[in-house]
Amino acid sequence: MSTKERIEIISCGPGLSEVNSQCGRSSDWLSNLINNDSFPIDKINAYKSEMPTLSEQVVWIILGSKHSVYDSYKWISNLKSKILDAIQINIPMLGICFGHQIILSALGAKVVKNKKGWEIGSSKISLTDKGVE
């Protein structure tokens, strides 16, 4: 396994103003939690047609969005294509909310609108041995 040199936080929208005003931008949440001396962080604005790097020395974190994976925006289809390319070269990636959905959609999963609306919450997770590496 190659050494990862940096993390790319992929923003999929400016965020909801109500959330930004109370909690700040979601792209800043993760960078504030990660020690930048150990892992340099680049922020990529996919919704502005910036695309992440295809390199074995990078890890992607794809964030949430007010948009839906099935919306017809060019940046969404471009990001899906990049995700497939990244999977081919084994770029590790984490999807949060929209990010999770776009990874699955790129892989062919059907993503549909929830009849109950948005679901928001948190869950405890644990790292596998490979995740600890």
Question: Which role does the model predict for each range below?
Answer:
Residues 1-89:
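N-terminal beta1-alpha1 cap of cysteine-dependent amidohydrolase-like domains
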Residues 38-41, 111, 133:
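Secondary-structure boundary/capping signal
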Residues 63-131:
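Cysteine-nucleophile active-site neighborhood
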